């Protein structure tokens, strides 16, 4: 009945708040763990090729094809791909500047993201470890631009990265992958609750 809908909505809002708190704690755990990593300090440019790929316009996106990564993660699909292997990419333009994504194999990455390509440095760095390391990094200090926020290549090249041995990196990557899996599951559940909240709000005013 309509009288119970407000209580159902309040329950949904409470569950959303709990999930958001849990997600924040999980992300904080990754940051805390990365701050306690010990190893050699190297510049990011010493272990990765850093570049912006060719941009395609939104009108070129297709319903089928290969995933396209832009300023907001996955933004659509395209008939071709410009990276055969999975890649780390950092949003370098707009309000999501500094967001780190790990792409699927055979994807197109646009010029709104900076690629951190470690394919030629596999003996030095574990790609998944570096992804988690950068995901825990606060990029605010290198974001520039008074109108549209942006990250340019030079300060990225000079980022100091702490690298344990390659075997330790792989071990840590496994642990952080489990944390990431928990974040991803919570994110999906959170989206379901948000959808439920929006539905209940609409129903209350019918």
Region annotations inferred by a language model:
Residues 28, 32, 178, 185, ...:
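PAS-family sensory domains
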Residues 171-181:
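Extracellular/lumenal glycan-associated surfaces
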Residues 49, 132-139:
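Short, intrinsically disordered, mixed-charge
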Residues 70-135, 144-147, 152-156:
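A short beta-sheet element
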Residues 2-70, 158, 163-166, 189-190, ...:
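Non-catalytic DNA-recognition/assembly elements of restriction-modification systems
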Residues 23, 148-150, 169, 196, ...:
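Glutamine-centric residue-chemistry signal
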Residues 1-13, 34-37, 115-124, 136-141, ...:
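Proline-centric
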């Amino acid at each position: 009945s309509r009288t119970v809908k407000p209580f159902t909505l309040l329950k949904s809002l409470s569950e959303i708040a709990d999930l958001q708190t849990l997600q924040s704690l999980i992300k904080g755990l990754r940051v805390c763990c990365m701050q306690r990593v010990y190893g050699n300090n190297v510049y990011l440019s010493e272990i990765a090729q850093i570049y912006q790929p060719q941009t395609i316009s939104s009108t070129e996106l297709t319903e089928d094809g290969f995933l396209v990564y832009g300023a907001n993660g996955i933004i659509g699909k395209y008939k071709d791909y410009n990276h055969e292997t999975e890649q780390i990419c950092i949003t370098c333009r707009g309000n999501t500047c500094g967001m780190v994504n790990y792409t699927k194999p055979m994807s197109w990455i646009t010029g709104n993201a900076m690629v951190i390509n470690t394919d030629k440095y596999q003996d030095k760095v574990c790609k998944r470890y570096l992804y988690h390391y950068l995901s825990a990094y606060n990029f605010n200090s290198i974001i520039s631009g008074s109108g549209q926020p942006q990250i340019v290549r030079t300060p990225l090249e000079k980022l100091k990265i702490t690298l344990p041995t390659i075997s330790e990196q792989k071990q840590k990557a496994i642990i952080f992958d489990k944390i990431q899996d928990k974040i991803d599951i919570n994110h999906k559940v959170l989206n379901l609750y948000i959808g439920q909240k929006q539905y209940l709000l609409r129903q209350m005013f019918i």
